[in-house]
């Protein structure tokens, strides 16, 4: 194949992957909108961050809203079409700003944000989540819209924190928050409040997967900023974000945080940890991203193919393990049925 044609094919594949990343990370855009619609409940620790931010790590803008789309920011890090990328970012920011302004004017959306924070606080305090208490939070003028407001709060809880708001009984007077993730909790985390924090795991794993199975620290912080989580600033759910992603999730073996090989000055990247590989799969993460976008995994062709290969490799490993177990069990049964013989010794 002529060299020029190969270059065109490589460029086309690169653009296709960038489009997949953009589509896959719309979930970050949505979570950013949710964050901006409701009042902030994350107390700032002070003007001086508690930890020194690494070079190149995005910081919270002063007097401006946080970045409203991670999709453009992340995809642009790999694009060599700088001018086009900048235009896409500006267009995305303009659209997001318009969307945010509209949502702030929507009192039902505002009430849903207030209710979501109320439900999270109830859970954190280990207090029952009662319908009567939720009605007290909703402004008197909008009580007739309570069902719509509750549905909005439930969607936010699912999208941002991976939580499902379930009715405890048919009467619908009490509710419980249940994790939608398959990730387990073996007791190493400090308490049950950690499972909503783990709702960030699927989006984080998704970012890493879409970025080629490793994401730079800068890329991860762009994503965190979209969620309203900033380096050195306490967050209602995640606590101190740097500690959460570089220590807590690393110690739990969900993430690996390591220096980029041969980087000088040193730069760092995030990868899936062994526990993430054990408790979820690339296909499940892709299904999560697709669901958040109203799409299917097949809408991400290259990543779908990679996820399929991962599923096949896992199936082969499981098959090999089962075969070894069958062989071991057969050998054990054969030995147990063999007659016991005792050597005879002359007197």
Swiss-Prot record:
Q: Which UniProt keywords apply?
A: Tumor antigen
- Comp. bias (Low complexity): 328-347
Pfam families given in the database record? MAGE, MAGE_N
Span list, region Disordered = 1-104, 315-347
Q: Which InterPro entries match?
A: MAGE, MAGE_N, MAGE_WH1, MAGE_WH2, MHD_dom
One GO BP = negative regulation of transcription by RNA polymerase II
**Could you say which tissues express the protein in this record?**
Expressed only in testis.
Query: What are the MAGE domain coordinates in residue numbering?
Result: 108-307
The UniProt regions of compositional bias labelled Polar residues, in chain numbering, are: 39-53, 89-102
A GO CC annotation recorded here is: nucleus
Residue ranges with Basic residues bias: 1-17
Does the entry feature the keyword DNA-binding, yes or no? no
Return the PANTHER family for the record. MELANOMA-ASSOCIATED ANTIGEN B1, MELANOMA-ASSOCIATED ANTIGEN MAGE ANTIGEN
From the Swiss-Prot or TrEMBL record, give the protein name: Melanoma-associated antigen B1
Origin organism is: Homo sapiens
């Amino acid at each position: 194949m002529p060299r020029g044609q190969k270059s065109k094919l490589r460029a086309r594949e690169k653009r296709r992957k960038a489009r997949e990343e953009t589509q896959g990370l719309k979930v970050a855009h949505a979570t950013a909108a949710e964050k901006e619609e409701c009042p902030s409940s994350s107390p700032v620790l002070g003007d001086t961050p508690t930890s020194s931010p690494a070079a190149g790590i995005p910081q919270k803008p002063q007097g401006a809203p946080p970045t409203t789309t991670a999709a453009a920011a992340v995809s642009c890090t790999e694009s060599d079409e700088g001018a086009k990328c900048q235009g896409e970012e500006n267009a995305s920011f303009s659209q997001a700003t318009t969307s945010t302004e509209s949502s702030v004017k929507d009192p039902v959306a505002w009430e849903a944000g207030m209710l979501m924070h109320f439900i999270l606080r109830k859970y954190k305090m280990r207090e029952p989540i009662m319908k009567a208490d939720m009605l007290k939070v909703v402004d008197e003028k909008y009580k007739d819209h309570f069902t719509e407001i509750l549905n909005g709060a439930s969607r936010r809880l699912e999208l941002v924190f991976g939580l499902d708001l379930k009715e405890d009984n048919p009467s619908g007077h009490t509710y419980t928050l249940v994790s939608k993730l398959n990730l387990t909790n073996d007791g190493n985390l400090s308490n049950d409040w950690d499972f909503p924090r783990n709702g960030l795991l699927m989006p984080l794993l998704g970012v890493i997967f879409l970025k080629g199975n490793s994401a730079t620290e800068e890329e991860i912080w762009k994503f965190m900023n979209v969620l309203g989580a900033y380096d050195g600033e306490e967050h209602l759910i995640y606590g101190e974000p740097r500690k959460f992603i570089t220590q807590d999730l690393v110690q739990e073996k969900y993430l690996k945080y390591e220096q980029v090989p041969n980087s000088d000055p040193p730069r760092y990247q995030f990868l899936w940890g062994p526990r993430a590989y054990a408790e979820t799969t690339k296909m499940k993460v892709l299904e999560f991203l697709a669901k958040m976008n109203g799409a299917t995994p097949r809408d991400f062709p290259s990543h779908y193919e990679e996820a399929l290969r991962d599923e096949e490799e896992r199936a082969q490993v499981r098959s090999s393990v089962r075969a070894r177990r069958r062989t071991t069990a057969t050998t054990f049964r054969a030995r147990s049925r063999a007659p016991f013989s005792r050597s005879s010794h002359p007197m």
